[in-house]
Amino acid sequence: MAIKYAMTYQSTRGEDEGAGYSDIVLKGLAADGGLFMPRIYPQVTKTDLEDWRHLSYAELAFEILRLFATDIEEDTLKTMLAGVYREDVYNNGRTGEDFSKITPTRSIDGGKIRILELSNGPTLAFKDMAMQYLGALFEYILEKRNTELNILGATSGDTGSDRKSTRL
């Protein structure tokens, strides 16, 4: 599907900021304290969903994010996501699993229930799914704008500095 709009975001509290994707990533919250939400919601058709069924995780992330991150060139976004969602990063699953799936599913109860595994990333937490992308996204935006940003974060011990893979 061809993108024919420039996605902008506004505050949930009503202030009409009209900010782009990269702007809201750096701002975090709207000036009035609200969260950012898209001004319009992209339409995804049944055909789109069918076409996306067999994509890799990185490819599917690209198809969805390109609808919202219209200020990032598509080739750049695609490369970024392919670099983030890689088999060698998401390889902390069960022995014998296909790590290329990034988020494999497994069946229980005779196949009646399927569980999506979101804890195969570097810190073994579901948060890796978003945070790995967010790190790459910040690097891209800050480099493009030739600026720096200091982020102070706090975490609990289960995904923080007690993890061997965490770099401080």
Question: What are these model-derived regions, one by one?
Answer:
Residues M1-R167:
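PLP-dependent amino-acid enzyme catalytic core
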